[in-house]
Amino acid sequence: IFDEVQTGMGRTGKLFAYEGYGVEPDVMTLAKALGNGVPIGALLAKDAVASHFKPGDHGSTFGGNPLVCAAAFATIQAIEDENILTNVN
């Protein structure tokens, strides 16, 4: 499990901090920078882990609604389209 709440979304020069360590997490948490100021929480999991979740097993006060999902999408799109990570590195 990698907690990318503070380190994700390019803050370390990579989109996610784990990319700098040569490992790949089974589960990753995101928040804060993912929404670029809009409160959001997210849990990403590989299929082998996610397949064990059933409706109601996991919830988030700031996850899944249309506003925060649009904000997260726009944030990721801006990071990619504006080559922000190139400038960070």
List each model region and its residues.
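Conserved N-terminal phosphate-binding loop of PLP-dependent enzymes in the Aspartate aminotransferase
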Residues: I1-N89
